[in-house]
Curated annotation (Swiss-Prot):
This is tRNA pseudouridine synthase A. It comes from the Bacteria. Belongs to the tRNA pseudouridine synthase TruA family. Substrate binds at residue 112. Formation of pseudouridine at positions 38, 39 and 40 in the anticodon stem and loop of transfer RNAs. It comes from Bordetella parapertussis (strain 12822 / ATCC BAA-587 / NCTC 13253). NCBIfam families: hisT_truA. The keyword tRNA processing applies. Signal peptide: none annotated. The active site is at 54 (nucleophile).
Length: 270
């Protein structure tokens, strides 16, 4: 039995999140069915992922692992599994890893990118793939509010009531807000994220950007540790799992899908 890691990308618009659900069609369902077909239909295949994305959330870089007796070249895994996947899900790479590697528990950090379209009307060509705000936004105020969130904190004010995490303390290493033409690009990196944490952070930052709340409110909200005081959970459309960081001992290059994700913004929109 050997352990294989695979890197995935997917458009989450058509799927009810990553994780298998009793009455839903999920990315995990599709991937495990494709793996079973590639393996010859010898039984179910179980996978573990780096980050469980919600309904409508995308991935430019999702990492999974599975244990298997099947021996194939790396490129055979990529081409073979992709042959059984729908167009909105793709295996980008595959490689053997040691039994010490765990897609979820070995990860040092995850990075999410949120694409927000600023315009009078919603972006038809980005439907399902970008969030939308039609009100003017005070970006400097949003950046000031974002700085109050950096570091290790209890993020209870930004976790959903369905969150199953054992504790709400997370370390937010990065929260950048970049202007790219009509888009705002939010980049968030943390050791791990709570359920709906990114979308709740975006929702709160938009409250500040729209002038409904002050920069000081963000700090007070963080300290309150009460989700009921926070902003509504923002739409999933523009959210992408974009990078996973693992210790050097596992021999991965930087697993960052951000270059592919942000390539449309290079040049004319940069």
């Amino acid at each position: 039995m050997s352990r294989i890691a695979l890197g995935l990308a997917y458009d989450g618009s058509a799927w009810q999140g990553w994780q298998t659900q009793p009455h839903g069609v999920t990315v995990q369902d599709q991937v495990e069915a494709a793996l079973a077909s590639f393996a010859g239909g010898g039984g179910p295949v179980a996978t573990v992922c780096a980050g469980r994305t919600d309904t409508g959330v995308h991935a430019a870089m999702q990492v999974i692992h599975l244990d298997t007796d099947l021996q194939r070249r790396d490129e055979s895994w990529v081409r073979g599994v992709n042959a059984f996947l729908p167009p909105s899900i793709v295996v980008q790479w595959a490689r053997p890893v040691s039994e010490a590697f765990h897609a979820r528990f070995s990860a040092r950090s995850r990075t999410y990118v949120y694409l927000l379209w600023r315009g009078r009307v919603r972006p038809a060509l980005w439907a399902g793939r970008a969030g939308w705000a039609f009100q003017p936004l005070d970006v400097p105020a949003m950046r000031a509010a974002a700085r109050t969130l950096l570091g290790e904190h209890d993020f209870s004010s930004f976790r959903s009531s369905q969150c199953q995490a054992r504790h709400p303390v997370r370390t937010l290493h990065r929260l950048d807000i970049d202007e790219r033409g009509a888009f705002l690009v939010f980049t968030l990196r943390a050791n791990a994220f709570l359920h709906h944490m990114v979308r709740n952070l975006i929702g709160a930052l938009l409250q500040v950007g729209q002038g409904r709340e002050s920069v000081a409110w963000m700090d007070a909200l963080l300290r309150a540790r009460d989700r009921r005081l926070g902003a509504p959970t923002f739409m999933p459309d523009g959210l992408y799992l974009s990078a996973i960081e693992y210790p050097a001992e596992f021999g991965f290059d930087e697993l960052d899908g951000g270059t592919m994700l942000l390539s449309p913004f290079t040049g004319a929109l940069g």
